[in-house]
Amino acid sequence: MKQNKKLILSSIVAALALFLMIIAGIMPIGTYAIPVLASLLYIVLVKEIGYGWAVMAYAVTSIMSLILCADKETAINFILFFGYYPILEMQLKKIKLLVLRIIVKLTIFNAAMIVIFYIATFVLMVPASAYTVFGLYIPWIILAVGNVVFIIYDLSLIHISEPTRH
């Protein structure tokens, strides 16, 4: 594919991802669901034109999300995990030992979620009540449930990014 077509495709993906990120502010589940949807677009870039272009589109979407998204927590979720993970996941497939690959993926996810939690709490000033249910402060429970959801997300990415076998 010619360079100008690669630029056009990566620009379209970045624009679509940014559009999704911007509309996340008007959807109740947008903080988590929209970054996941936006992240799926980067699989196309990796498959069609390569990692470099996907990383460039991710960087553009990340910067523009910080500037244009009303919901900064959504932008942070995208920047610190969901935006780059599909690109990275395709590289993590190269780790042959399944147990090691799973440990690496879960470590990346948990580290990102902990950083996102602290940024949301101390920089974006998300109140502690957002992490409280029936008087219980539950960030660790949320993280545990998040690990289960992450495994489903990761398995979905694997199946989406692999060619269909007949």
Predicted regions and their residues:
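Alpha-helical transmembrane segments of multipass membrane proteins
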Residues: 17-21, 65, 85, 109-117, ...
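Membrane-interface helix termini and inter-helical loops of multi-pass transporters
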Residues: 123-136
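Residue-level detector of conserved catalytic or cofactor/ligand-binding positions
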Residues: 156-166
